[in-house]
Every structure is written in C-alpha cells, then in structure tokens.
C-alpha cells in the first residue's frame, strides 16, 4: 500500500510539473518570437498573418456599411435614423461615382507610407552602423529586438497591405462606404504619428543605455512572479529558473555598462540615469524580498571555506592524512542580487569620479538616500549602512585627491551625512509604526495545510518547524498542543534580534562612520567639507536620541515575551548611543571651531554665499560650555573654552559687516544688541564658570578663567573695550532683544543646578534664608534662598567685576547698576 502511495504521489507531482512547464513554455512562446525560422519563412508568415487579419477587418467594415444602408435598420429609429441613412447612402454613392479620387488619395498615402518606412529603416541602419555594429552580441540583439520599434514597423506594413486590398476592391468594383473611408483615414493618421514616434525613438537609441529598458522590464516581470506567492514561486524548479533569468538580465546590464564605460564619449548623464534605474530596481526588489521563503532556490549559494583554527579534529586528521586542504560549506547568499547591482553601480560611480562629474554623484547620492526606508522595512539595513560606508570611503579619498569646488565639497560631505540621517529617521518611524501584532501571530495560519507567513519575522526555519510540528499534532491528536505563547516567543526573538541589529548599525554610523568622515577631511585640510559635517552633529544627535529611545522601549517590551529561559536570547545592551556621541562631539568641537574659523577667514568676502556655519559653531560651542558647567566636566570646558573668545569675536566682526549698513535710528538699539551679544555670551559663560569654581571649591575653574583673561583680554585695551560695551548693555532700555530668550534659558539651566548644590550653606534671617559662608563673592551676589532669581546680578557682571577689573585701571573698571561690588571689595 505504501509503495502504491509513493507511485501515485510521484505521478501526481510529475503531472503537476508538466502542466506548469507547459504553461510556462506557452507563455514564453507568446512573448518571444522563434529565432530558428528562416528569413523568408518569417516574411511569408508575417504577410499571411497581416493578410488574414486585414481580410477580417475589411469584411467586418463592409458588413457594417451594408447594415447602415439596409432597410431593416429603419425599424429601429424614426426620422433621425432615416435622415442618417439617407446621408450615408448619398456619401456611398458619391464615393463609388468618384472612386478614382479615393483611389488616388489612397495611392498617395501608400507612397508616403512607403517613404516613411524607407526613411525609418535608413535611420535604424545608420544608427546600427554607428553605435551597435561593433557592440557585443547581447547589446546588438537588444537593439534588433526592440519591441516598440518592431511594432511601429508592423503598423506601417499592415497599413500598406490594408490599403492595397482596398485598392483591389475598387478595381473589382466592390462598393465601399463611409466606414471604410473613416477607418482608412484613421489608419493614415496613425502612420503619421507612428513616424514621429519612431523618429524620436531613433534619437533615444543614440544613448546605448536605452537598450536596457527591455532588460529592466524583464527584471520587473520576474519580481512580479516572485510576488504572486502561488504556483510558480512555490515550486523549487521555477525558483531556480527565475534566478537564472535574473542572472542573465544582470549579465546583460553588466555588459552594456562595461561597453559604454570603455568608450571615450562623455556619457555622464546617461551613466547617472542608469545608476538611478539600478537603485529603483533594488527598491522594487526589497519590496518583494521579504515575501520569498527563506529556503527558496531563488537565493544563490555561497561557498564558505573552513578555517584550520576552528575545524573539527576529524576534519584536520582527514586533511593531514590525504594531504588536502579543508573542505568548504555551502550556505544561502541572501544578498546575491544586491551584490551584483552594487558591482555595476561601483563601476559607474568610479566613472563619474574619473570624469569629474561630481554634480552627478551628488544627485545619485540623493536618490540612494530614498532607498533607506525600504532597506529598514525589508530587513536589509545592515547591508545598506555597509554600502553607504563603502561609498563614504571612496568619496573621502576622492575629496582628498580631486580638486572640488567648495560647493561640491560641501554638498558631497552633507549628502553622506544626510544618508545616515535618513537611516536614523526611517528606523525610528518603522519601530513606532510597528504594533504588537508583529509578535502576536495568527494561530490559524499555523494550523493550515500550507505554510504562509504574514510578516518577515515569520520567515525563518524555526518558525517553519513549529508549523510542521503543529500539523503533526493535529493529525495525531486532533488539535494543536503547542501553546500560543511559545510561538509568539519564537517570533518575538527574531524581532528582538532585528532591532538589536538596527541598534548596532546606528551605533556604527553615529559613533564611527560620521566622526571618521570629519577626521579624514580635517587631516587633509578640507575645511569646507569638515565644517559641514560638524554642523550636522547636532542634528545627528537629535535623530539618534529619538531613535535610541524607541529602540530601548521596543527591546524592553520584547523581553517580556521570553517565557522559556532555555531558549537563549542575546543580552540587551546598554543603549547609550547618544552618550558616546556626546563624548566624541565635545572632544571634536575645538576642531570644528578651527576649521570653521579658517573657512570664514579664507572666504571672508564671499561668506554670505554659504550657510552661516560660523554662527552655528559659536552657538553650539556656548551650549557645550553651559552643559559642561552643569555637569561639572572641567576637561570638556577647558578644551573648548580656549576657542570661545576667538570664535565669538570673529562672528562679531562678521555681523558688523552687515550691521554697519543699517542707518535707521529706530533700529540702532537692536543693532547694538546684536553686536554686543558675543561679548555678553563670553562674559556670561566666564562668570558662571568662575562662580561654579567658587561654589564647588574647585579652583581649576577660577584659574582657567583668570589665565585666559590675562592672556587674551588684557592685551590692546580689549578688557577696557569689554567694560565699555558691558556698561552700555547695563544702561540700555529694558526690552526683548535678539537671543534674549536663549540667554534666559542658559541662565535657568545653570542657576537651577547651582542653587541645589550642597556646598552652599544657608541660615535663617527673620523670614528668609540667606547665604551662610565665608565666600565674599557668594555673600555679595546670592539672593535669598528660594527667590525667583538665584543671583542678585547678571552673570556677565560677575566676570566683569571679579575678573576683568583685576587687570584694569581704576577709571576703566566696570561698575554694576546697584553697586554690589563695593561690598565685594570690602
């Protein structure tokens, strides 16, 4: 009985396969014309087909004409129908009476059509001789078998046969009517339009990349079959067949590309469009890839050579005994299509670089960034980030070696960073949009006869094994025994590992690849590119902060699905991407100041043509220093404070170029506020740092402020000018000026931390708590405890009174509004 079962099963499988093969072969026969018939047979066959087709068309038209003039049609209408019929009959009578005129017009159109056909064939032949005669066979065949071109030629030849048959009817004195005239006129117009279309297509074929359109069409057909998820894709034979077809298409794309790149013609625009088409193909493929079963023969095999250091003793013994090398393993290569497209685009990218078509490279990078969302959704984010890094390495080298314009250098650096930013944004959006249904599977799909997966997290061997086990349980026990939580746990593990992989890729991009780009550009004195990368740091931090928050939340949530501890999950890492990035950022901010200052000085007269990165650098530097005071990071503060005065004074001088042109009297107070803001910010930060040194008891803070002031501010009467400007600020009218809100935020951040410091002792004094310590400075500037204002004065006044006044003559010293310095000097 068992033997009979296997025979029947074999017959059934053979029959099903033969049916599939027949349908597939039949479909190919309809799409591709047989190539093994002779030229004469092909011509006769086409003539016969056109002749038979036109016989049916003409017969149908003649029948319509006869119906229009028949008496029976009068029964279906009233006077209007009769008038229409009379008009048709009069037209038909005139046509037959003057059939010579119609025959002459038709003969003229036939002649014109013949001329069109001859001209077009001549154009095709000249194009072939110029572009394709010496091309590889695969390329010339693509040109020869162009579907649209052949259809246009077929349209002209069909019309010629149609017209000749009508002339034959006229010679035979067979009546023709208005319907035949209308159809003939329409076909004549079609010929004219076809000629215009074909002429335009001839010019299109002057770009030899244009012949690849049919290859892309075949690739998209293959992807369409992969998406069907039914008969063909579920059969191993057809999976392998589609893979072979795709490989042939990729071979043609490679050959076309290599042939074009070897020519000396300038084809940068065509190469750029070709690269974009490849990215679009990859985009479509990633839309369908997650639906392909993990064990499909669509995926190619890859050889992994075994290593001696981790080989089994039996393998090593066998190799030593036979004198051979270790063997190899064969695994599925799930990235074979991506790798082939990558090779093609790498050659194109190198061509654009060699031809100095940097604008094309920049546009292509913009297209590549659009691939980020699909990479995240399809689980290919690791490959995508690695590919971006490869491009970054190549472009880093190019920026160093080639003479870019400043705009191109800045644009290339920015696009590289923006590509990584797109990954951060798309990962966050993907995780935010993913609901709990990703891990809560549909149990009915596991109880069905066929294995179906609704999510890419179901497309794994262990999930397939659970399905097969449940099918066995149902057959033996009549019901499912495997608990639902166990199935959800297995699926949740794959989701968990996918998020971990995203975390590692974000960490690489943020804390290694982007800083490496900035470092490389700095080392090679490419200040414009480095400046742009540094300017993006705050945006990178913001996007990384949001992404890591969602990552951490999802990882913690997924760990709740781990019920069976014998199934080992990877440990949840300490999600600290932003903290690591902050350390790098603070350590490199001085380099940002350096490259930005150099760029501004070198392009002082044309700086307004570029983004105001000097202003961004100054503002973010202040933010770093404020945060360093709050977090008591002296080393960070010390390394960045030395750049503060130079950057702020440089930016003040740049702003003066524009402010000096403002002559309106009513705007002078605002002009003064903008001009003095850099001095306020420097003095404010210096004052808070000195105050923090006084409160914390760490003298390094005060020594740093005093040392830098003596070194930089006391020379050339700079300190005196500082005091004059600060005095002007003290005496100005109360109002909201530029950056006042920002200054208030800085003050609130610092004073909130300082007021809660345990080193400040308080004592009760009637209804208040006042400072109870030995510091003359704190006794002079601190308000009562829990007051709205922590300080009695502005922070910049602390710097002016306590630090600046030390180095000034008595008549040049700064005086505060309420004279608190008198108490301090006592």
Residue ranges and their predicted role:
Residues 1-114:
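Membrane-anchoring hydrophobic segments
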Residues 7-8, 12-21, 141-143, 168-826:
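Binding/recognition "hotspot" determinant
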Residues 36-54, 93-111, 135-155, 175-184, ...:
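Membrane-interface segments at loop-to-transmembrane junctions
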Residues 46-49, 124-127, 599, 699:
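Residue-level detector of solvent-exposed, low-hydrophobicity positions
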Residues 64-73, 96-172, 191-202:
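Transmembrane alpha-helix detector for multi-pass membrane proteins
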């Amino acid at each position: 009985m068992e033997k009979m079962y296997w025979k029947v099963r074999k017959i059934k499988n053979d029959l099903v396969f033969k049916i599939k093969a027949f349908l597939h072969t039949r479909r190919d026969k309809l799409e591709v014309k047989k190539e093994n018939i002779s030229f004469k047979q092909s011509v006769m066959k086409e003539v016969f087909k056109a002749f038979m087709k036109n016989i049916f068309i003409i017969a149908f038209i003649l029948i319509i004409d006869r119906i229009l003039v028949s008496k029976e049609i009068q029964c279906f209408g009233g006077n209007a129908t009769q008038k229409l019929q009379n008009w048709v009959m009069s037209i038909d009578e005139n046509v037959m009476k003057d059939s010579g005129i119609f025959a002459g017009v038709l003969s003229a159109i036939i002649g014109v059509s013949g001329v069109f056909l001859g001209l077009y064939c001549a154009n095709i032949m000249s194009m072939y001789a110029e572009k394709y005669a010496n091309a590889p066979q695969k390329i010339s065949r693509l040109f020869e078998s162009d579907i649209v071109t052949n259809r246009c030629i077929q349209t002209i030849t069909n019309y010629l046969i149609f017209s000749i048959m009508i002339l034959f009817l006229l010679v035979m004195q067979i009546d023709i009517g208005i319907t035949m005239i209308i159809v003939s006129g329409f076909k004549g117009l079609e010929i004219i339009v076809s000629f215009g279309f074909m002429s335009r297509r001839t010019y299109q074929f002057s770009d030899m990349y244009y012949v690849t359109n049919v290859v892309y069409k075949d690739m998209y057909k293959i992807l369409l079959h992969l998406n069907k998820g039914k008969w063909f894709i579920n059969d191993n034979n057809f999976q392998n067949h589609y893979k072979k077809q795709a490989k042939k298409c990729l071979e043609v794309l490679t050959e076309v590309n290599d042939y074009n790149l070897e020519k000396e013609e300038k084809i940068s625009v065509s190469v750029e469009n070709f690269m974009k088409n490849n990215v679009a193909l990859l985009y479509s493929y990633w839309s369908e890839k997650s639906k392909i079963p993990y064990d499909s023969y669509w995926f190619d095999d890859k050889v992994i050579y075994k290593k001696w250091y981790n080989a089994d003793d039996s393998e090593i013994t066998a190799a030593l005994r036979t004198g051979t090398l270790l063997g190899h393993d064969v695994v599925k290569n799930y990235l074979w299509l991506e790798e082939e497209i990558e090779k093609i685009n790498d050659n194109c990218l190198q061509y654009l670089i060699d031809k100095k078509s940097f604008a094309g490279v920049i546009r292509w990078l913009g297209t590549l960034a659009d691939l980020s969302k699909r990479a995240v959704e399809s689980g290919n984010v690791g490959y995508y980030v690695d590919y971006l890094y490869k491009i970054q390495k190549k472009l880093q080298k190019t920026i160093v070696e080639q003479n870019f314009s400043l705009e191109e250098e800045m644009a290339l650096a920015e696009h590289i960073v923006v590509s990584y930013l797109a990954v951060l944004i798309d990962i966050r959006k993907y995780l935010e949009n993913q609901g709990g249904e990703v891990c809560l599977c549909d149990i009915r799909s596991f109880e069905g006869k066929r294995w179906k997966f609704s999510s890419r997290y179901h497309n794994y061997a262990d999930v397939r094994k659970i399905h097969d086990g449940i099918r066995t349980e149902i057959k033996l026990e009549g019901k499912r025994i495997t608990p639902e939580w166990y199935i959800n746990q297995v699926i949740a593990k794959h989701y968990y590992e996918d998020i971990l992989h995203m975390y590692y890729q974000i960490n690489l991009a943020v804390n290694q690849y982007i800083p490496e780009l900035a470092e490389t550009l700095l080392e090679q004195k490419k200040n414009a590119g480095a400046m742009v990368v540094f300017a993006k740091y705050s945006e990178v931090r913001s996007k990384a902060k949001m992404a890591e928050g969602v990552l951490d939340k999802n990882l913690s949530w997924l760990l709740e699905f781990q019920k069976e501890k014998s199934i080992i999950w990877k440990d949840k890492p300490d999600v600290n991407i932003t903290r690591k990035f902050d350390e790098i950022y603070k350590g490199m901010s001085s380099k940002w100041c350096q490259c930005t200052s150099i760029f501004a000085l070198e392009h002082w007269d044309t700086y307004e043509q570029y983004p105001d990165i000097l202003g961004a650098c100054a503002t973010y530097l202040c933010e770093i220093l404020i945060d360093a005071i709050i977090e008591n990071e002296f080393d960070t503060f010390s390394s960045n404070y030395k750049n503060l005065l130079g950057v702020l004074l440089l930016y003040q001088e740049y702003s003066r170029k524009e402010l000096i042109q403002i002559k309106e009297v009513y705007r002078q107070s605002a002009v003064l506020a903008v001009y003095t803001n850099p001095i306020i910010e420097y003095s404010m930060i210096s004052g808070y740092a000195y105050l923090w040194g006084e409160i914390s008891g760490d003298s390094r803070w005060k020594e740093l402020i005093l040392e830098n002031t003596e070194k930089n501010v006391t020379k050339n009467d700079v300190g005196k000018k500082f005091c004059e400007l600060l005095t002007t600020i003290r005496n100005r009218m109360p109002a909201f000026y530029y950056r006042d809100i920002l200054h208030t935020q800085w003050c609130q951040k610092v004073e909130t931390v300082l007021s809660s410091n345990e080193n400040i002792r308080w004592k009760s004094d009637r209804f208040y708590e006042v400072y109870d310590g030995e510091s003359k400075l704190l006794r002079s500037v601190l308000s009562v405890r829990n007051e709205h204002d922590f300080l009695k004065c502005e922070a910049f006044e602390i710097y002016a009174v306590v630090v600046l006044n030390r180095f000034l003559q008595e008549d040049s010293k700064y005086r505060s509004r309420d004279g608190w310095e008198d108490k301090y000097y006592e």
